Amino acid sequence: MLTKDILGFEGLYYVSNKGEVNSYFRPSHNGIRSFPSKKILPFCNGTGYLQINLTNCLGHRSKYYLHRLVWETFNHKIPKSLEIDHLDNIKTNNHITNLVLLTRKQNMSKMLNCNPHVLNNLKNHIL
């Protein structure tokens, strides 16, 4: 299993090529509280994608899509014209080998080919 620091959160969090996020141990600076290293559990956002809360060094917490963190950590920033696709169509499988960049058109075409009932429902709704 490979791990790398998450871009923008170096020294705070790292992610594996399997899509697992952990925090680093952070010692106390004032003797009051230290933070142990621990696995950060993702949550489902309601559309099937996993998200994760990360807190920066200033204490500000933000939500991030796990598949985007994995891709950008092990590859490069995602261009605005591209989207991440899960090759096996399982939105919770965020292993780096299961992620690929597609255009919006390619991603929608794949979704409709894998889910023909969606297109039929749209046709029935419009007509």
What are the residue ranges of the model-derived segments?
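Conserved recognition-core residues within compact binding domains
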Residues: M1-I84, I90-L127
